[in-house]
From Swiss-Prot:
ATP-binding RNA helicase involved in mitochondrial RNA metabolism. Required for maintenance of mitochondrial DNA. Residues 1-61 form a transit peptide. PANTHER family: DEAD-BOX ATP-DEPENDENT RNA HELICASE 50. GO terms for cellular component: mitochondrion. A motif (DEAD box) lies at residues 392-395. The gene is MRH4. Residues 224-233 have a biased composition (Low complexity). It comes from Pyricularia oryzae (strain 70-15 / ATCC MYA-4617 / FGSC 8958). Its EC number is 3.6.4.13. This is ATP-dependent RNA helicase MRH4, mitochondrial.
Amino acid sequence: MLRSSLGSVCLACRISGNAGAAPGAVAYRPQLSTAIRGSTIQLQSSLSFSTSNARQATRRERTPSRMVLSDRVGRSTARDGDKKPRRRVDGPFAGMNRTVANFDPETRSKLSRDNSNNNRSSKNGREGGKKLGRDGKGFKALNMQRSLASIGYGHRTTVKAKMQEVDSFDQFDLLPQVKDAVLNEALKGMLDIKPTPVQRLAIPALLGQTTGARSRWRTKSKPADSGSEAASPDAPPPPREEFLLAAETGSGKTLAYLVPAFNALKEAEASDPDIIAYNQRRAEERALLAKNPGSKIKTRPEPHPTMSRPRVVILVPTAELVDQVGRVAKSLSHVAKARTRMISANMSATMIENDVFSPAGIDILISTPHLLASIAESHPNILSRVSHLVVDEADSLLDRSFSEVTTPIIDRALPSIRQLVLCSATIPRRLDNYLASRFPNMRRITTPNLHAIPRRVQLGVIDVARDPYRGNKNIACADAIWSIGKEAGRHEGPVKGQVDVRRIMVFVNEREKTQEVAEYLKSKGIDAVALHRDTSEERQSEMLASFTSNETMSIPTPEGGVAGSPRSSRTLPNTKVIVATDLASRGIDTLAVRHVVLYDVPHTTIDFIHRLGRAGRMGRRGRGIVLVGNDDRKDIVAEVKESMFMGQALV
């Protein structure tokens, strides 16, 4: 009624009380309404400005998904979506060490819950004021990452049971030449040859093997084109297989994907009609030349059917990883008889052309994405026969810096790919979301220790803010390296009269800091070099050669000991140091490194895992040292150290 009587009257007129006044009083409405409207517009603009600022602040505070570890790496695939989810049941030891009754909080009275909360808070205060996070766990300072979901008891038991069923490479359904290559070349010199945990899980899965209750590994039915002569040529190709290998650093992922790839390569080669016909023609030519040894007729060799068309392509982010993976593949190729080629920025254009387009053919190609993408632009057929594509260090190659180059390569090769394998030691949320949307049927093979630094790596913390360093990290770093060198100099090596050389890696956050720290260490008598993005590829490979070698380095024991020379000319001859950024923290198999110094505290726990993962590889012991200053988060370092001691995954 009131609204109908007033008619269409603005809010300013209603507030002024002149809505029902005489017509003569309407002259005052425009001025009053204009003033109120102006203030209303200012209020709305200020509210919208503050709201936009709040949104921008929230957007700034949100951690990028590429810097956050995923908590659902081992989730089931979309193929299991039609199954009814199983009820998660606690294991038989779930009730041990409980301090609070396992009641449903909703059924308890409010008073009892308040009393229990008060008791817990007072207990935490008596224990030194330890604060808990939102989820009740002790990792509160690591709020830049979200907590990883704990592996269920049933899943952990199942994975460990699978791992215990395999204790030898003889249990894998490998071709004789591939098995011989693994035992006599790739693992030559090892006394106790056993598969690592990721190899026990990944190799059978990539080979298509299943396990019985009390039997050894059995093979599935082979595809129609894997060797059966009765297979119809018009039969549809088998479906593409997609795998994610997620395991801790230094666990042997390279051999885990190389061995099945070699096995599939040799099986396909034995049934390829083009290769069979080519081998027959070559045999006839050799027989003809043997009958006429004096013949001077020289025929041009026929190009191999695999010329410039490899079957296996392996992508890695750096030239160092090209050399590292290439060495393992070459060792297998010597016995398995495969043509492996490596291309990187260290090679000239002529060498790359001779290797890729050689008439002898190519079976396995190991390259960086940028180099392979440039070749594929001018020669698209190079990816036309790829049956196995491996993306190593997938968290880097599918990140923002590489994804624009890596994704087109995957798209070009997808029509012919039989098996797609992605490997990484850390799975950020961005990569997890990408795989869930792009490859929803991908099978995820994860080890129980994913996102955890091995317990065999000890972590020490040096508070640089205290005496005698007084905030000088350069002095603290040099002192730590001198302590390591002098300790090693007190013990003789395997040869009498010689001491072992300690190879140490120092990690910094900024590229400019590498040269500064390296120069300071040189001034203190330490053999140190800087490794960063501006260092040439050849120089990088040269510096990392001694750090990736498994051979022991030793020098004659100096007179008077390692540090027995006069102070004016003190040197530390039994140490070699590389000062590097995260360029050297991804994938490089630094078997000789036992000590890692973190000059700067890493920005994320992902960098913690990769940097400390340079030590203690392949079951060896290692030690990490973190230099903590006043500007660093000491609580984060303390929680990382505690999680390493407990063998827990980082958050």
